[in-house]
Design a protein with these regions (language model features):
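Alpha-helical ds-nucleic-acid-binding substructure associated with the helix-hairpin-helix region
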Residues: 267-270, 284-323
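C-terminal extensions
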Residues: 303-332, 358-416
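Local cysteine-cluster metal-coordination motifs and their immediate loop/turn environment
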Residues: 61-73
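Short, electropositive alpha-helical surface patch
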Residues: 118-126, 130, 155-164, 224-243, ...
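Conserved C-terminal portion of the radical SAM core fold
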Residues: 169, 184-261, 270-296
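Flexible, acidic/Gly-rich N-terminal and inter-domain linker regions that tether
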Residues: 1-62, 367, 375-376, 383-405, ...
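Core AdoMet radical
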Residues: 73-88, 96-121, 127-148, 155-204, ...
Length: 416
């Protein structure tokens, strides 16, 4: 193996992969015993909260498409490189044996055609699994327009598949990527969803049925490139969760890197708070029982940057409050600002045996600086009397501190 040549390819293709936010760079130099190169190493988190290190690279940054927002676009004058199948396999196993990584995150520009590219991604995963007995995590990008046969094989070797929508609206995609259309991305999503269901049904009767994409599928939206409102983005995400059974939707604030009249100017920075608020709204849909239609409406198309989405929703719908915690159903307790999923379940358990008090809530981890205005308890709660007060918003602003409190907060460089 020509290590100097491989190192140069790794530098180019790891840098090209950094704009996919399905996992984040650790930025760790790893000095000392077992020192590793930081190029291509990123951290991601499993559903149970474990942090795993992944080799995150592109197979190639050559691409037949000329999407305005993409640094690998066909017309962009940048250094190009491409790994061979064996180079990616050897690189992955080399990092894995040294405990630098626990898995592989592999994407690619599209060269020649979709099947040609996807077939090589699958060959890498297959070779790792069958020839090298690689048991680590594998995340493959689904290439739009790839055949069903290749996608089926990909699902047998990858833990997760993802096809990035990038632009959440049809009009935005047509503006910035006229060579693509939404159905190119949704068709493979639908196929993977159906295969997941089919394999799960088969496993109920035939235990030897292999797993198909056990970690599910995901997608990513670029925020701020095409001028969509937060309402449009959230409703698009909600639709993908409902129709395609996605495990996650990721949101990436657009980082201006290319000069194009269709894009925001290079001096534009997407506020970090907007990206953060979208993740919080996504959390409400996934864990708190909110529908995408109710988080925002036509009168309120953007998320409130001063308050998290649940608190902002509560302020707009004060008729739902205060909530009597001693008797309210779990679904309503989950809508109280400052009460998380674990705390809500503890409240339901504890109230069967005793009267809930502020002291109990504090021990459960409830954020009382927000929750106290939206609840009633068996004991007196003078804060609940302020639910209809015009001053409530100001009081909450005084009591709420955010790490994004500076108005000029911008997105940090992923690899800076």
């Amino acid at each position: 193996m020509d290590y100097q040549k491989i190192s140069r390819k790794l530098e180019i293709l790891a840098d090209a992969a950094k704009y996919d936010v399905s996992c984040s760079s650790s930025g760790n130099d790893g000095q000392g015993l077992g020192n590793s190169s930081r190029a291509g190493i990123c951290h991601s988190f499993t559903e149970d909260g474990r942090c795993v290190s992944l080799l995150k690279i592109l197979l190639t940054n050559h691409c037949i498409y000329d999407c305005a927002y993409c640094t690998s676009r066909r017309s962009n004058d940048i250094p190009r490189a491409a790994f061979t199948v064996d180079e990616v396999v050897d690189l992955t196993m080399s990092f894995y044996r040294r405990n630098y990584i626990e898995g592989l995150f592999l994407s690619s520009g599209i060269f020649k055609n979709a099947d040609y590219t996807m077939e090589r991604l699958v060959r890498i995963a297959k070779k790792l699994r069958e020839e090298h007995r690689f048991n680590g995590y594998i995340h493959l990008k689904t290439i739009p327009k790839a055949s069903a046969e290749i996608l089926h094989e990909a699902g047998l070797y990858a833990d997760r598949l993802s096809v990035n929508m990038e632009i959440p609206t049809v009009s935005g995609l047509k503006l910035l990527a006229p060579e693509k259309n939404h159905s190119d991305m949704t068709q493979p999503m639908a196929f993977v969803r159906n295969e997941i269901v089919s394999f799960a049904d088969s496993r109920k009767t035939i235990k030897s049925t292999p797993k198909f994409v056990p970690a599910g599928q995901s997608t990513q939206f670029i925020i701020g490139a095409a001028g969509e409102t937060d309402r449009q983005i959230i409703r698009a995400a909600g639709g993908f969760y409902r129709h395609y059974g996605l495990k996650r939707v990721y949101y990436s604030g657009y980082v201006p890197v290319l000069e194009d009249k269709r894009l925001p100017p290079l001096s534009t920075q997407v506020p970090l708070r907007r990206e953060n608020r979208l993740y919080q709204a996504d959390w409400l849909m996934r864990f708190y029982g909110f529908s995408d239609h109710e988080i925002l409406d036509e009168q309120q198309p953007f998320l409130d940057l001063d308050f998290d989405p649940k608190l902002a929703w509560a302020l707009r719908h004060r008729e739902w409050f205060p909530v009597p915690l001693q008797h309210a159903p779990l679904e309503m307790i989950l809508r109280v600002p400052g009460i998380g999923v674990k705390s809500a379940r503890k409240i339901v358990q504890v109230r069967r045996f005793r009267m809930i008090t502020m002291a109990h809530l504090r021990k459960m981890g409830v954020a009382l600086n927000r929750a106290r205005y939206f609840i009633t308890l068996p004991e007196p709660n003078r804060y609940a009397d302020l639910i209809d007060s015009p001053q409530l918003r100001g009081l909450l602003l005084q009591n709420t501190r955010s790490k994004f409190s500076q108005s000029d907060a911008v997105q940090s460089d992923l690899f800076g």
